Every structure is written in structure tokens, then in C-alpha cells.
A protein has these predicted regions:
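Lumenal/extracellular "mature" regions of secretory-pathway glycan-modifying transferases
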Residues: 40-49, 54-58
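Long, charged low-complexity segments
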Residues: 52-167
Length: 175
């Protein structure tokens, strides 16, 4: 798993934001599969359980202490970006109230984890957008993955699953 965290950070270092984001959205899937083997065909459930444990606390706040990045929206972003290349999640069945993400590259003074929305005369929320700074978001996911690895460091089954992950071999090596 550490090789994927390192690859995410290397992508950020080289300003390969799309690569970093793709890995950051994929790693919780891997951890969820390993952590919750009894949920074999339920990737969404595994994903949000991992999110609740390792990332949700970083995305709670605001004036009413709401969950700014809800578990369903995190999974919807994963689906929209990895399968369709989009940040608009309106077509994702997993989403919760949010319509789209506005991801930005690093910029001093830019607000991270900032939600914008309109409320119509009937009290309905429209045009709900969550702005995330991609470097902070990806690093938060990396930190969550490292916490997960630490929490599971003595679990032989988890260690065995991690050893089975795909590893790239140096050019010229034979099998």
C-alpha cells in the first residue's frame, strides 16, 4: 500500500493532479476490500465504511458542524471521476445533496473544503458545490491510508492481502 501512497505524493510533487486524484480515489477501495472481506460484492459499502473511519473527521465543520464532504459524495466523486472523468455527480445514485465538486490546484489563500449552495423559496438546496484543493485532499487521503496501515500492521490477513497487490518491477527484470 505504501507504494501507492508514495506514487500519489510523487504525482502531486510533479503536479500530475489527475494522476494523484485517481490514486487518492482508488486507494480507499483497496483498503475497503481488504478490511471488509465479508462485503465482497458491496464496494460502495466498503468504501464509505473506510471513509467514516479514516477521513470523515477531516471534512466535518462549518457553522452547524455538518459533514461537509459526506460519505455518499466521496463515493459519488470516485465513481464520476474514475468512470466518467467528471466532477459533476448529479447522475450518481450514491450522492447526497451535493451536485458537483470544484477541485482546484494549490493556491495561497484559496479556501479548501468550502461548500456553496442556493436555497430556493421552498427551502430546497440547489447548485450545491464543494470546493476542494486537490493537494490537501490527496494528502488527507494519503494520511488516512497510512493510519489504516498502522492500525492493521499486526493483522496477518491484511499483510497477506497487501503483499498480493500489484507491484511494478524494474525494467529488465525477469519473472
Amino acid at each position: 500500500m505504501q507504494h501507492l501512497v508514495d506514487a500519489t505524493r510523487l504525482a502531486m510533487e510533479h503536479k500530475n493532479w489527475y494522476g494523484a486524484l485517481a490514486l487518492a480515489l482508488t486507494m480507499p477501495d483497496i483498503c475497503g476490500r481488504i478490511s471488509y472481506p465479508h462485503l465482497a460484492k458491496k464496494s460502495e459499502e466498503r468504501y464509505v465504511l473506510w471513509f467514516d473511519t479514516y477521513l470523515a473527521a477531516k471534512y466535518q465543520g462549518g457553522f452547524i458542524q455538518e459533514q461537509i464532504l459526506a460519505r455518499a459524495n466521496m463515493y459519488a466523486l470516485r465513481c464520476a471521476f474514475l468512470h466518467q472523468g467528471e466532477f459533476d455527480i448529479t447522475d450518481q445514485k450514491a450522492r447526497q445533496a451535493l451536485e458537483r465538486f470544484h477541485l482546484t490546484t494549490p493556491y495561497t489563500g484559496l479556501m479548501h473544503n468550502n461548500r456553496s449552495m442556493n436555497i430556493d423559496a421552498d427551502g430546497n438546496i440547489t447548485n450545491s458545490v464543494l470546493q476542494l484543493s486537490i493537494d490537501i485532499f490527496c494528502e488527507d487521503v494519503c494520511a488516512g491510508i497510512e493510519k489504516w496501515m498502522s492500525d492493521n500492521a499486526t493483522d496477518a490477513r491484511v499483510a497477506s492481502e497487501i503483499r498480493q497487490l500489484g507491484i511494478l518491477h524494474a525494467g529488465g527484470s525477469s519473472f
